[in-house]
Amino acid sequence: MSLEESIKLTVESLGAKLYDISTLREHDKNIFRVSITCEGGVNLDKCAEISRMLSPILDVEEPMNGEYLLEVSSPGIERKLKKVDHFLASIGEKVKVKNFATEVFKGELICADEEKIVIKTEFGNEELTYDNILSAATYFEW
């Protein structure tokens, strides 16, 4: 079983869903970030509970070389969309999508399936297949 599968099983056993795993460097510190979602929202107690359960797993199978901080959090209101499930869960939200031709499409995600998405932009509906998407994220208008 891979580390990601172990993390996913642990997160799901505690009533949450694994959204994403990322590694990054902030303020000269390595961070292993586990983003989760929960029905009803993610709270601090749930993050702490999952962190406590993941810590022994990560002690055995280190996710990064050297010292790192484990961070368990929600993906936030403005989050990256990387998987089909992310797009499916974001239907009805505002998204910003960049394709490989570096065109940027902003608008409401009105449809998503296993092959493509449809964004309602100010210029009309734009259909994009996943293999044409360079990056995508939800965004919030204040």
From Swiss-Prot:
InterPro entries: Ribosome_maturation_RimP (IPR003728), RimP_C (IPR028998), RimP_C_sf (IPR036847), RimP_N (IPR028989), RimP_N_sf (IPR035956). Keywords: Cytoplasm, Ribosome biogenesis. It is found in: Cytoplasm. One of its GO terms (cellular component) is cytosol. Coiled coil: none annotated. Signal peptide: none annotated. One of its GO terms (biological process) is translation. It comes from the Bacteria. Required for maturation of 30S ribosomal subunits. Belongs to the RimP family. This is Ribosome maturation factor RimP. It comes from Aliarcobacter butzleri (strain RM4018). The gene is rimP.
